[in-house]
Amino acid sequence: MMSKRCLKRNQTLIPELLKNHGALLYGDTSVVDLSTAENQLLMEELLPEFQAAFDANTWSSQELAYSEGVGGCPKVRGLIADLVNSHFQPHAQVDKSHIVLGAGGCFALNALIEAICDPGDGILIAAPYWPGLDLSISVHNDAKAVVVRVPHEDFFRVESIRHYSKALLSAPNLVKAMIICNPHNPLGRNYPRETLQAIVDFCAERQIHLISDEVYALSQHVQPTSENPSAGFVSALSLDASHARGLVHVVYSLSKDFGCNGIRLGAFISQDNKAVVMSGALSTHCQTSTMATLVAQKIILTDENIQFVNTYGRGLLKSAYTVMEEFLNQHRIEFVSAECGMYIFAKLCGDRTSVDDEWLFQAILRRNGLVLSAGTDYHCKTPGWFRICYGCDREKLRHGLDRLRDCLQEFGETEFKFPFNDACF
């Protein structure tokens, strides 16, 4: 006998995951994975620091004990507060008491949503968005994603508010919150300050919570200049939210910016809502490993490493992005110009925008041993868009783009014919 939850997952969610990511889930090494957003460029640079730390014999029995403090390791919460105060320009100083640690950004978000939403409550979120958020919203918490269709030309503009307002009024559920990804995944762009302020004002007026997912905050390609002073990352914490007291929350993780997805250490920040902090701390109690918090203290969140990520790390991402951008321009492929992150959103199927054509292209990708993420998995309404990740070493990226070139050529020479038989590829 199994739970209804288990049966539902095996009937719907798990088959979809296996269909799209089966080769990766089963460890097939013959495929080139450009679907996973990892900063592998930084991983290689960080590896000697990890090895040195393990060789230095700086361990104590404390690393084998339970973590101390409400909300996770106090030292790491203090270091994250220092990072945010130095690089997110918060309107009010962030204190470690505002921070709750989790085993990665997703589990921090799980705890935050659990503190805000009852089962069945709605959360506004604009599409496209990273499908992993559905796990935190619907799978782990039984809340409901209220998908907002914002036209691309309005997505990062103040004009987007009217689309959120329309979705809120027509939602079949009680809407408790709104999630934004800033920097955005998969579009690779930052929200301008004026749009963020409009979003905070909207949430304050409607008395709903704003959750800003800022896990790519330091993964920037473009710096503000005199010609483009508004470029760059703006945190929701930097805004005057005095009229939205207790409603603004930020999720952050070390995974993306610092190239350490496997360490599993994230956090949420709530400056003016002690009830949310305490509830979240209860949900994540003893969730984070003392090994992870030790690595964060000794290696990841040192001043030297943060400076390295903010300078050299940005250059690595910019160089890889340029390779990706040149490839797409060379093949006359439409894409969303990115200014942050380690991925690009591209219309690989061109003018062929039917579901059948996207299925055909995905079959061609599988045949050529290349893994990309389809935009429809990100709730993109128009088939044919894909997210391509480029935060890997240059040789892997070159190999992946060679395979993508072959896929594009084969797709251009192939017409979809019904009935569609995936096995023929």
Curated annotation (Swiss-Prot):
The modification N6-(pyridoxal phosphate)lysine is found at K256. One of its GO terms (molecular function) is pyridoxal phosphate binding. InterPro entries: Aminotransferase_I/II_large, Ethylene_sulfur-biosynth, PyrdxlP-dep_Trfase, PyrdxlP-dep_Trfase_major, PyrdxlP-dep_Trfase_small. GO terms for biological process: amino acid metabolic process; biosynthetic process. Pathway: Secondary metabolite biosynthesis. Pfam families: Aminotran_1_2. Its cofactor is pyridoxal 5'-phosphate. Its EC number is 2.6.1.-. The keyword Ubl conjugation does not apply. Gene3D superfamilies: Aspartate Aminotransferase, domain 1, Type I PLP-dependent aspartate aminotransferase-like (Major domain). Signal peptide: none annotated. Keywords: Aminotransferase, Pyridoxal phosphate, Transferase. It is an enzyme of class 2 (transferase). Induction: Expression is positively regulated by the thioclapurine cluster-specific transcription factor tcpZ. Probable aminotransferase; part of the gene cluster that mediates the biosynthesis of an unusual class of epipolythiodioxopiperazines (ETPs) lacking the reactive thiol group important for toxicity. Firstly, L-tyrosine is prenylated by tcpD, before undergoing condensation with L-glycine in a reaction catalyzed by the NRPS tcpP leading to the diketopiperazine (DKP) backbone. Afterwards the alpha-carbon of tyrosine is oxidized by the cytochrome P450 tcpC to form a hydroxyl group. Belongs to the class-I pyridoxal-phosphate-dependent aminotransferase family. This is Probable aminotransferase tcpI. It comes from Claviceps purpurea (strain 20.1). The lineage of its organism: Eukaryota, Fungi, Dikarya, Ascomycota, Pezizomycotina.
